Amino acid sequence: FLRYTIIMKENYYTTRNLKDNEKISELLEKQLPPFCFDYFLGIESLTSCQTRLKYAYDLCIFFDFLCRKKYPKKAPLDLTLEDLEAVTNNDIELFLSYLSGYRYNGKILTCDAPAKSRKLSAVRAMFKYFFNKGDIEVNNAAKVATPKCREKEIIRLNENEVSELLSVAESGRGLTRHAIGYHDK
């Protein structure tokens, strides 16, 4: 049984990674500038497939923003490393502001502080990669402050709730039919 479980997990992750890599390839072909191919190749051994996919989605939004606001006569696929190097920290701050309410793929979207922070992380990682390689001379993304995220309050059970939870877990009373099936295992 354990061997079967391990094989199933491997198949799940392998299948998921294959699908994610296909999505990344599609984004590289259809929505991202050509220099992004080098970037994603360069970070492949350093990041998980899921991270790269999220970065690809976030960079699509970033390059769409650049083409709308800074390079209106260009499409994302036409951008060059010279265009990237010309992006200022002010441009990136405008991007973060833009994320408060923007149109992408025909939808109106918004981002909260954690989402803005993640998108900034994707942009910073890309700038850092090209800066470290010597392809750009200035890493302006490093100059941009990270959006402040509110700390979430820790939710705790009171003594009665803990007691009730343990009682239900031990006895199974009050569970749905579906939950009872798991409880009986």
Task: Give the ranges of each region predicted by the language model.
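Conserved catalytic core of the tyrosine transesterase superfamily
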Residues: Y4-K185
